[in-house]
């Protein structure tokens, strides 16, 4: 899909196709054991899966207070919310014609659910009240290609654009609200590989403990550390296993990084991050798998478990298909 003409209807198939091509070009898979979810007895109060509305076509997931979750739709731009312990969902943000949501991130300071996506050919970043569903900010990103994921830091919202080699930044005020300024951009330089047309580059994004950013690359593979001030990007060396491929969403819990690889194998790669000689190093810890995973796109951590939303990209009947969240044991 050309970056200048994003299509809601073709989004899922195009996304799957781009990542699958990357996986086919790289035959290496993560070394280390694949951990099936065999420890569910430790969380008897939590379900193995959480049902989502049929036809939702989910992609982004984030978690709020307690066991509250939020999931966005790539097909109609709605956000649904519910409890990971079960009990159904409700619509937080109503659908809108032409709107497509991708990454979501809940900011506990403000109770806002931030979302990236598009309305037709326009790229947007939204802030939605996590209780009422009111849209408190709608930031137009001029020149955007394919906004994909985001992270909220102390003074900014950073977001990836999978078709452009840059990160976007929305300034926040001291209260964690949008400061009302136009987005700024930082070009990805250094070791970052150029993103070819009709492929996906930067995808998942999280903030490291030193204030730098970690991103993955859906086509070229690897984990990458970005200096947010200069854009200089260095690949994070992976030990005890080959570099990851086909990454989508990222989750960082302490020093453990989870790389969701839906189209690359329907699993979650696990890494232990540490600084060594002034650079970040990732030690492969294996993979999380489960029979109920079906092209997971993103995940969130809540109630001691990792929760992966199954986007099911490539399903022949996406507008009527069943969708669900899979619980995975953290390790």
Positions of predicted regions on the chain:
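Beta-rich, blade/repeat-based domains predominating
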Residues: 53-69, 96-117, 141-158, 191-212, ...
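A short helix->beta-strand "capping" segment at the edge of beta-propeller domains
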Residues: 40-55
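Beta-propeller blade signature
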Residues: 127, 322-330
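N-terminal secretory signal peptides
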Residues: 1-13, 21-29, 38
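Hydrophobic alpha-helical segments and helix pairs
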Residues: 130-185
